[in-house]
Design a protein with these regions (language model features):
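Non-catalytic connector elements of ABC transporters
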Residues: 5-32, 38-39, 46-49, 60-61, ...
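ABC ATPase nucleotide-binding domain helices that frame the ATP-binding cleft
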Residues: 38-41, 140
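ABC ATPase nucleotide-binding domains
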Residues: 77, 92-227
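ABC nucleotide-binding domain signature
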Residues: 28, 70-72, 76-86, 186
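A position-specific signal in ABC ATPase nucleotide-binding domains
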Residues: 48-49, 56, 102, 179
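C-terminal boundary and immediately downstream tail of ABC-type ATPase nucleotide-binding domains
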Residues: 221-244, 271
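Conserved ABC transporter NBD signature motif
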Residues: 53-65
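Catalytic "switch" loops of ABC-type ATPases
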Residues: 47, 78, 82-90, 191
Length: 345
């Protein structure tokens, strides 16, 4: 199934300006809070109206400003899962699933029974939302959406208010329950781990502007743009200048990089993820190293996070790899392996 979204909308704090098209089934939207992610979903669902553009699902036009097409939300065949699931508190599970369904009584009963079985809710039919766990509430909300047989499902940060353990558990449940759904799912989050795990393709938004759109794993591995690197979790990014085809100056790190690959002319920044440094001891100073001056350390259950000043560097070390540091002390330098250096613009 194909999906296209090309929209513009003026908002009080920024202008929403997006243009992407895909035939993948699982799409992620990543961005900081207030960057325009929820407004994008509301525009797709028909809750908000863009100032210009077009939205289509599998050839069906949901919105086209020039042609004056703007289908009402209830006619778009789009399911929208809100952050709080928006269940009716005084309705039972089966009543929530049946709410708003059209058709004969027999048809409604059949569709409700199908979703109760699909989402493993058969023993909970008479319970109310307040008597359900977070995972059960999520399944009821999804069952209500799926009873409408939508072409497109929109998930608006469904785990934002949950702790890390429950968030991981519910994400796994969500992926399992949607495994046999043939439509497109758009998953919005400010959590990069969630969108990496869920999505095949990823849209990154920053202050309403489309930073990039493409294969999720490729964007994490080769972000290319500074904003993409930052939003996918790169902790070490510094302004850089191309000196020639194989050399880059990084003044903030007091470093000149020598590279085998050709340096792109559009280069503006250099980055390296915090886990990718190689520690070096002794007075030897090979190419592509930064001096390491420990200013702070934070211990976490499975890793240490070291912070250097002059230059400002973050270095993360897994506890399973920490023995050498315990034996030899802090390294004098950190090496930037060329294959881990991010050349950005």
């Amino acid at each position: 199934m194909s999906f296209t979204c090309r929209i513009k909308k003026e908002l009080p704090d920024f202008s929403l300006d997006l243009s992407f098209s895909t035939d993948q089934k699982r799409i992620g939207i990543l961005g900081a809070s207030g960057s325009g992610k929820s407004m994008t979903l509301k525009s797709i669902a028909g809750i908000e109206t863009p100032d210009e553009g077009q939205i289509t699902v599998d050839g069906q036009v949901l919105f086209d400003k020039e042609k004056k097409i703007n289908e009402k939300p209830q006619r778009r065949n789009v399911g929208y899962l809100f952050q709080n699931y928006a269940l009716f508190p005084h309705m039972s599970v089966e009543q929530n699933i049946a709410a708003g369904l059209k058709g004969t009584k027999e048809e409604k009963i059949r569709r409700v029974q199908e979703q109760l079985a699909r989402f493993r809710l058969e023993g909970l039919t008479k319970r109310f939302p307040g008597e359900l766990s977070g995972g059960q509430q999520q399944r009821v909300a999804l069952a209500r959406i799926m009873a409408y047989e939508p072409q497109l499902i929109l998930l608006d940060e469904p785990f934002a208010a949950l702790d890390a353990f429950l968030r991981d558990q519910l994400l796994q449940e969500l992926m399992e329950t949607l495994a046999d759904y043939d439509g497109t799912v758009i998953f919005v989050s400010h959590n990069r781990d969630e969108v990496y795990r869920f999505s095949q393709e990823l849209l990154i938004i920053d202050d309403g502007a489309q930073v990039c759109f493409g294969d999720t794993k490729e964007l994490f591995l080769h972000p290319r743009k500074m904003e993409t690197a930052r939003l996918t979790g790169c902790k070490n990014i510094a302004p850089a200048k191309r000196l020639d085809e194989h050399h880059v100056s990084v003044p903030d790190w007091d470093l000149t990089l020598t590279l085998q690959q050709e340096v792109p002319s559009e280069l503006r920044y250099v980055g390296i993820r915090a886990h990718m440094f190689e520690p070096l001891w002794g007075d030897m100073t090979p190419e592509n190293v930064v001096a390491f001056h420990l200013s702070d350390v934070a211990e976490y259950p499975f890793e240490y996070k070291y912070y250097s000043h002059s230059p400002d560097i973050c270095w993360y070390v897994q506890k399973s790899s920490h023995q050498e540091i315990e034996e030899r002390g802090m390294p004098k330098y950190l090496r930037l392996p060329e294959e881990e250096i991010l050349l950005l613009w």
